[in-house]
Structure formats: structure tokens, C-alpha cells
From Swiss-Prot:
Belongs to the purine/pyrimidine phosphoribosyltransferase family. Homodimer. CDD domains: PRTases_typeI. The gene is apt. Gene3D superfamilies: 3.40.50.2020. This is Adenine phosphoribosyltransferase. Pfam families: Pribosyltran (PF00156). One of its GO terms (cellular component) is cytoplasm.
Length: 170
């Protein structure tokens, strides 16, 4: 299935000069959504992983379904002040400024093997922050799965040390 058919480019969103990849048509099509989840679940079943980790918000949509399909635990990574218990916190750089990602202390167990799922790989900043959170939890990232890879925004060898799945490349 050609998943690109279900992604719509929205120019100048959320700001001038950005071309936003809208995945809602994919989510709205039961066959495309099922195919996406099945592809990601098959990928993580090939890895010896314990946990699926994903950042908000669109990462949650994919990763929770994949975790269910692969019978794996699901752990959330969120922006500050969204998780009610003690958290690990990592600051990371954005194009303009910094942001934070957080994970509950104790959600990942020492030596847990983790696959991270997100909708889009752009510069890799969010993903690196998640890797750092996993390390703080004394767990290990084994692999990553992305619906979309914006190859023009990062080095071609980014995250080569991991098993990486990319369903759509631009």
C-alpha cells in the first residue's frame, strides 16, 4: 500500500514557510491505518523488546495501537507539567529555543528493551531527548519506528546504531 496517498501537505502550517504533513486522512482510512499499525507491529515483533515508548501527541495515536497489536507495554513521554508523578526531565534544542520531554520515574524498569514510535522524524531532537530519558531510566533503546521520515532535515546516518523502520520517506 502506498501510504503517501493518505498524507496531505498543508502549506504554511503551523507557520509561514512550513509544509505540514497531515496524517489525519491516513487515520481516517481504516485500511491505511490498519496497514500502518500492522507494519509497525510486525517490525517490533522482530525485535526483542519489552516496551513501546512514544511522545505526544500523534505518537500516542500510533504507538498505543502498535503496543496493543504486539502485546507490549506502552509508556508515555510528555511535555512538562502533564505527568502527575515524579519524572525524569530532559531539555533539548529546537530550531528556536529549547523544550523539555518527561517520563514517569519507574514506568521503565532497569534493562527494559525499548522501541520508540513517532509519527515524524524531522531533525531528531525529540528522538534524542527520548533516548536520553530511556537511559536515565536505566533502560535501553533497541529500535525506532516512524510513519514519516523527512530525510532532508537530518543526516542520513542519524540513529544508524539502532534498528529503524521508516514507512514513508520524503
Amino acid at each position: 500500500m502506498n501510504l503517501k496517498e493518505f498524507v496531505v501537505d498543508v502549506k504554511d502550517f503551523p507557520k509561514q514557510g512550513i509544509v505540514f504533513k497531515d496524517i489525519t486522512p491516513l487515520l481516517n482510512n481504516k485500511d491505511a491505518f490498519k496497514y500502518t499499525i500492522d507494519q509497525m507491529a510486525d517490525f517490533i515483533k522482530q525485535l526483542d523488546v519489552d516496551v513501546v515508548v512514544a511522545p505526544e501527541a500523534r505518537g500516542f495515536l500510533l504507538a498505543s495501537a502498535v503496543a496493543y497489536a504486539a502485546n507490549k507495554r506502552f509508556v508515555l513521554v510528555r511535555k512538562p507539567n502533564k505527568l502527575p508523578r515524579e519524572v525524569y526531565d530532559v531539555e533539548y534544542s529546537l530550531e528556536y529555543g529549547t523544550n523539555h520531554q518527561q517520563i514517569h520515574v519507574g514506568d521503565l524498569k532497569p534493562n527494559d528493551k525499548v522501541v520508540v514510535i513517532d509519527d515524524v522524524l524531522a531533525t531528531g531532537g525529540t528522538m534524542q531527548a527520548i533516548i536520553d530519558l530511556v537511559k536515565l531510566s536505566k533502560a535501553e533503546v533497541i529500535g525506532m519506528s516512524f510513519l514519516i521520515d523527512l530525510t532532508f532535515l537530518h543526516d542520513v546516518n542519524l540513529f544508524d546504531q539502532y534498528k529503524v523502520q521508516k514507512l514513508i520517506k520524503y
